[in-house]
């Protein structure tokens, strides 16, 4: 088995809320020394063909992926599906259903942005920043607020207006854990808990989440992640060992101007953990 030296299995393109095309991401990953890469756009597989072609041209090993939105106990929890078959009908239908709920949410968010800031044309402004009109999300509104001079950065836009509990946040009921994991497994992929350190759960709630996740067929957890500090990595190393999960590593890169770290700029997995690539070797597309 080939063990990658610098895998990055979580990032976003303009097909969801990133700012670069899949080909630009593949080139950036190669330049950063990433040797196993996955594009994991939110609730879509639209960019995967472009990503595969670009990864091959850049000489980078490639895994298919998508980041699915779910709701668990009224909190949005993201599940990354790695190694999925992009042609699977059940996965495509499930993602279509999730995306269909995004436009009404975006229109309500636009109404709140206009009410709170006095800036008109918020929906159209966010849409200009969205590479996929079916996937208008909070980062697109953040970029609109920066464009209009209301905020100096996307992070300020989230802190003032768009984060959970802020005046322009619109809660949403996404897919269930069972649905998302089912779609991923039906498509031949592995369900991986994305950036668990970001969720506002107590230790007991965290245990219940992973008990349900593994019972439903979840097999991986992001241990090394741009959102995780040293303590988070310690906690989720323990979770991986306790529940027998494979460990993943991802930058969650969105944009050269907005992301805190570049593709691949992460510490290695802690010793003793099994990387998700060990279970997905047969789904990895190696460069020729």
Tell what function each PLM region has.
Residues 1-4, 284-288:
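Short, low-complexity, intrinsically disordered N-terminal peptides in bacterial proteins
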Residues 1-76, 162-163, 175-176, 181-183, ...:
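An N-terminally biased module of ancient metal coordination in phosphate/nucleic-acid-related enzymes
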Residues 54-211, 272-274, 285-288:
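Extended substrate/RNA-proximal surfaces in nucleic-acid metabolism proteins
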Residues 90, 258-259:
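A short acidic, helix-capping loop that chelates divalent metal ions and anchors anionic groups
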Residues 208-223, 261-287:
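Structural recognition of alpha->loop->beta junctions
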């Amino acid at each position: 088995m080939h063990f990658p030296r610098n895998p990055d299995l979580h990032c976003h393109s303009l097909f969801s809320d990133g700012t670069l095309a899949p080909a630009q991401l593949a080139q950036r990953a190669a330049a950063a020394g990433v040797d196993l890469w996955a594009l994991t756009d939110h609730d879509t597989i639209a960019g995967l063909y472009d990503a595969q072609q670009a990864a091959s041209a850049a000489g980078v090993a490639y895994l298919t992926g998508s980041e699915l939105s779910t709701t668990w106990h009224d909190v949005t929890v993201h599940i990354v599906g790695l190694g999925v078959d992009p042609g699977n009908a059940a996965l495509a239908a499930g993602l279509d259903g999730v995306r269909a709920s995004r436009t009404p949410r975006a229109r309500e968010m636009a109404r709140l942005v206009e009410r709170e800031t006095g800036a008109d044309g918020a929906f159209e402004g966010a849409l200009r920043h969205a590479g996929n009109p079916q996937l208008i999300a909070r980062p697109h509104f953040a970029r609109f607020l920066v464009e209009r001079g209301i905020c100096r950065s996307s992070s300020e836009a989230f802190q003032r207006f768009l984060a959970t509990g802020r005046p322009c946040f619109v809660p949403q009921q996404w897919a269930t854990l069972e649905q998302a994991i089912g779609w991923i497994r039906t498509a031949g992929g592995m369900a991986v808990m994305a950036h668990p350190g970001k969720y506002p759960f107590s230790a007991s709630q965290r245990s219940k989440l992973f008990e349900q996740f593994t019972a439903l067929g979840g097999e991986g957890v992001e241990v090394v992640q741009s959102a995780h500090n040293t303590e988070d990595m310690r906690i989720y190393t323990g979770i991986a060992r306790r529940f027998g999960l494979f460990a993943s590593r991802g930058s969650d890169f969105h944009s050269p101007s907005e992301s805190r770290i570049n593709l691949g700029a992460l510490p290695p997995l802690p010793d003793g953990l099994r990387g998700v690539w060990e279970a997905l070797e047969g789904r990895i597309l190696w460069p020729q």
